[in-house]
Amino acid sequence: AGDPTLSASELGPLSSVLAADHLSEQLARAVKHGATIAGTGTQDGAWFSPVVLTDVTPENPAHAEEFFGPVAMVYRATDEAHAIEIANDTPFGLGSYVFTTDPDQALRVADQIEAGMVFINGVGLDSPELPFGGIKRSGFGRELGRFGMEEFVNRKMIRVLH
């Protein structure tokens, strides 16, 4: 609990010790294939300290994996088009984030990102009235919001010719 930018703040545990063990294995594999870890990445039971991975190449297994824990991968992009290419080079597409001071760029980039949800200039902006869901291997369909309600409705078409 607490401000995530303060070292005294504590993150809650992962869903299980097994989940934390899997995260440790993923990080070890990423480092073995050339990634660099910033942060401690230490495990204590189901607790896991935050990690930032850099130097992840497309050949690194981490590039195509989901990390269910406090892990962020940081990539360097040469320009906006390259950043979009990096963002879309994944089999997953649940949520993405765009941070910019240019509102036109924010919408232009968000429109090109292949994800079910794109949040601009903020994290944790989801809400029960907004649809939630992904594309690619991150699922299909939506839950929550009007679109989510429609996922649980059976519609029937009846056509009568006279």
Segments the model singles out, each with a brief description of its role:
Residues 1-25, 42-48, 64-69, 128-131:
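Flexible, acidic loop-helix segments that line cofactor/substrate-binding pockets
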Residues 36-41:
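Diglycine-centered glycine-rich loop/turn motifs
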Residues 44-162:
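Conserved C-terminal structural/oligomerization subdomain of aldehyde/semialdehyde dehydrogenase
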